[in-house]
């Protein structure tokens, strides 16, 4: 069901009023274009992947990084304009990382009148106890965080957990799976958790990381560093990021092309027998039926 207005309506709305969070943002043409583009792409992902059911409550994960701040701001802007008929609850999970500035997020959320929940769970100690010194903590830390966020979503009556992954996150995951996992899989824009009671949504799936960086700078979000624990993301993801940046530099626009390709698959032109019945082609040949598939 189409729950959101068309793009023309959205673009007209983007020129009008907005959430108080945007009260002191730049009035430049450049920023207005950036905001409009991010709103349009966020709305497009929400519509394309049927994320909205009226009356829902969404738990918006807020880490303090540029992506989650941008996600929250764009969703609040859409809701302020009457374009997102859901209730939003921001949530930060303080995982006990060393030197985590506990005051920044509550101060920011309270100052802007944003409904939120802050919860402390010392997953940092769990990770450091389980993994040898020098290991990359990000994967285990993320899994533990996700489990707590699912629990909080249930406790708060939220049917969806909303995450700030963007276009580059999806492409990097695709190539990590391709090169290191031997499978064609990316990061889904919409996923039901294993228990079947919380939907995971990624409304920024079409948004470019560089746009979110510019947006965060213009909005003056109080960014919290993601490396407080001293660990860095694995070399595999960093290598994929560097590869994609090199491709984009040499052939501008390829990232957008790759994202479009992920929604334009041809199972008959791959090698997965679970997706396409190659054996049925023998019967088709005998009966003379047309089984062509855009060769």
Curated annotation (Swiss-Prot):
Annotated compartments: Cytoplasm
HAMAP family linked to this entry: TtcA
Record-listed E.C. numbers: 2.8.1.-
One cellular-component annotation, GO: cytoplasm
Function, in words: Catalyzes the ATP-dependent 2-thiolation of cytidine in position 32 of tRNA, to form 2-thiocytidine (s(2)C32). The sulfur atoms are provided by the cysteine/cysteine desulfurase (IscS) system.
Cofactors (names): Mg(2+); [4Fe-4S] cluster
Gene giving rise to this polypeptide: ttcA
Other observations noted: The thiolation reaction likely consists of two steps: a first activation step by ATP to form an adenylated intermediate of the target base of tRNA, and a second nucleophilic substitution step of the sulfur (S) atom supplied by the hydrosulfide attached to the Fe-S cluster.
Protein name in UniProt: tRNA-cytidine(32) 2-sulfurtransferase
Enzyme class: transferase
């Amino acid at each position: 069901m189409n729950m959101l207005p068309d793009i023309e309506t959205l673009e007209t709305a983007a020129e009008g009023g907005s959430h108080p969070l945007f009260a002191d943002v730049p009035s430049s043409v450049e920023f207005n274009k950036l905001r409009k583009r991010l709103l349009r792409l966020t709305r497009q992902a929400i519509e394309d992947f049927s994320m909205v059911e009226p009356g829902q409550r969404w738990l918006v994960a807020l880490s303090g990084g540029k992506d989650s701040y941008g996600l929250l701001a764009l969703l609040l802007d859409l809701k302020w304009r009457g374009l997102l008929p859901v209730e939003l609850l921001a949530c930060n999970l303080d995982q006990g990382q060393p030197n985590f500035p506990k005051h920044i997020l509550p101060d920011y959320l309270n100052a802007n009148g944003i409904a939120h929940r802050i919860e402390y769970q010392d997953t940092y100690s769990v990770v450091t106890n389980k993994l040898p010194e020098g290991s990359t903590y990000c994967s285990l830390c993320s899994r533990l965080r996700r489990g707590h966020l699912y629990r909080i979503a249930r406790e708060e009556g939220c049917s969806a957990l909303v995450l700030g992954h963007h276009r580059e996150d999806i492409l990097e995951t695709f190539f990590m799976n391709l090169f290191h996992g031997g499978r064609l899989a990316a990061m889904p824009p919409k996923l039901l958790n294993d228990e079947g009671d919380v939907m995971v949504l990624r409304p920024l799936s079409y948004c470019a990381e560089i746009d979110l960086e510019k947006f965060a700078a213009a909005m003056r979000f109080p960014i919290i560093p993601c490396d407080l624990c001293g660990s860095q993301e694995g070399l595999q993801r960093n290598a994929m990021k560097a590869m994609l940046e090199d491709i984009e530099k040499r052939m501008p626009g390829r990232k957008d092309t790759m994202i479009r390709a992920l929604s334009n698959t041809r199972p008959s032109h791959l090698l997965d027998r679970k997706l396409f019945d190659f054996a049925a082609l023998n019967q088709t040949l005998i009966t003379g039926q047309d089984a062509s598939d855009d060769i």
